Amino acid sequence: KKILLLGTYIKRSANLYFLSQEYEFLPQQELRLTIDEAVRVINVCGTECSVVYHTTGPMRATEVARLLDLLKVVTEAAMGGLYSLFISVSDGEMDLSVECAAELSFLASPDVTVQQEDGLWLVRTRIGGGSGA
């Protein structure tokens, strides 16, 4: 399971790297392809996972890569006891609602807020550079 997940992240990260060398902004479709592939693999690994998008325009390639990196760190940290993961992406932020046995407070940083409520972790990061900014 871990190898499948890691392989997916490596593939998508490499793809985003090459795209970012050519384009500053990526269309919504590329964001969706990136996150949707991760969601499919997380589901294949036996964790309930879904995503909803509230995006209205292109996003900086560097932001898409950063969102994928955060998703990777969260899933790796929680992998042994990850029960469910719900992802919400808008132009201004990405929210991860994580039900897991792991402690996720270490993820907190100036760019990432982490809260635990009713047994769920809410991991949130702001997104800059959406829709032509």
Model features per residue range: what roles?
Residues 55, 102, 127-129:
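Beta-strand elements of well-folded, non-transmembrane domains
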Residues 29-63:
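Helix-loop-beta hinge of the Bergerat
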